[in-house]
Amino acid sequence: MKTFKLIPFLLLLLTVAMPASAQKKTQKTYIPWNNGKLMVSEEGRYLKHENGTPFFWLGETGWLLPQRLNRDEAEYYLEQCKQRGYNVIQVQTLNNVPSINTYGQYSMTDGYNFKNINQKGVYGYWDHMDYIIRTAARKGLYIGMSVSGAVL
């Protein structure tokens, strides 16, 4: 009779202990470009890596990511995309001309003259774009860029 009382207790203990031990394991980030550059297959029908590993483009569309999200929000958004299994995040570099990001920085500070696009001492529009790309890379995500959503 004592054995029958012990079994539910042990099952309860296992039920509580199993998720706790699973949470301690950290998942290693899969870095797809370790397989080489992306290229079109010889048949011209699909994408693959340089070493022949197939690549399936599973994209999330975050068109306004560079304009609307700050660094913390971008980090969170990209982490959520990674957790959901996306491997490409599609963004617009310029939603309109000029584009303005959440920090109030303009994409084209000097019109179409890009020689001085990075202003010294300012976290500019393109610095934020670089941050997004680096953050995505750390998470094993590609960034698919569209130049513009509006007519330039």
Report residues per predicted region.
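Active-site mouth of glycoside hydrolases
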Residues: 27-152
